[in-house]
């Protein structure tokens, strides 16, 4: 299964073929499966709404392969007992482990909890079509186990993500004359605020909240005030 996932390109928002693979795999195992977009999920055979539910979740989308690859990223290669390929670690390996654990317990009648297995999409881009799009379909969840590469250590907390697209509005003018209002100069003050601001609250486990300015776009010509 992991080798198949590696060899099917599944960039974020383009995971339809790996979603097809996962859906077919569950169905072949006799598991009733649900799908919305490229999110695939299933419940244990003896699901009981009076019991607490444990969510098993990981994602099947990947980032683009970087230029440093020395092997074919879309070829599952085993060397020295290790499996190489794009998504083998993040997060195909954890995903397959969770799926196999789910199947191992799928038809048990004596479980004190329900199991909900969700293989989700668009994780790498925090996309609207990812896990957040199906939360209302999953029902109440007591606790979640998320498969991610954590060096085989249990991780009990994680920083969230908020992306801000900020705009500074200027007025165009010729760069050689004292005219226009430079949007870059306006933005510098705000960029410095992002760099120096300290939030009053800190996480006991993760420390202070960090804000970083990562992309700046401005101007169209060297001689025009943006």
Model-derived regions: residue spans:
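Buried hydrophobic positions in well-ordered alpha/beta secondary-structure cores of metabolic enzymes
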Residues: 9, 26, 42, 56-59, ...
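Acidic-enriched catalytic cores of C-N bond-cleaving enzymes acting on peptides and small amides
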Residues: 176-225
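Glycine/serine-rich anion-binding loops at beta->alpha junctions
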Residues: 64, 82-97, 174
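Acidic/histidine-rich catalytic neighborhood of metal-dependent amide-processing enzymes
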Residues: 91-163
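Predominant activation on well-ordered alpha-helical scaffold segments within soluble catalytic domains
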Residues: 3, 23, 96-99, 103, ...
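Acidic/His- and Gly-rich active-site-bordering loop/insert found
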Residues: 1-86, 108-111
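Phosphate-handling active-site elements
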Residues: 79-81, 101-116, 194-204
């Amino acid at each position: 299964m992991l080798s198949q996932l590696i060899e099917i390109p599944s960039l974020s928002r383009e995971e339809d073929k790996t979603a097809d693979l996962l859906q077919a795999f569950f169905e072949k195992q006799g598991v009733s499966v649900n799908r919305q977009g490229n999110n695939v999920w299933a419940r244990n055979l003896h699901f009981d709404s009076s019991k607490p539910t444990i969510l098993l979740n990981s994602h099947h989308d990947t980032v683009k392969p970087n230029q440093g690859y020395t092997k074919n990223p879309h070829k599952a290669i085993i060397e020295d007992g290790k499996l190489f390929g794009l998504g083998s670690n993040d997060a195909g390996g954890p995903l397959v482990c969770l799926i196999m654990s789910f199947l191992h317990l799928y038809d048990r009648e004596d479980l004190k909890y329900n199991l909900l297995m969700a293989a989700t999409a668009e994780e790498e881009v925090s996309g609207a079509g990812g896990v957040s799009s199906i939360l209302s379909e999953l029902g109440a969840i007591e606790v979640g186990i998320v498969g991610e590469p954590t060096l085989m250590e249990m991780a009990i907390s994680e920083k969230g993500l908020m992306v801000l697209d900020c705009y500074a509005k200027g007025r165009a003018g010729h760069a050689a004359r004292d005219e226009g209002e430079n949007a870059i100069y306006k933005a510098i003050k705000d960029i410095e605020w992002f760099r120096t601001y300290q939030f009053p609250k800190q996480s006991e486990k993760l420390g202070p909240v960090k804000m970083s300015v990562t992309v700046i776009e401005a101007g169209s010509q060297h001689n025009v005030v943006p």
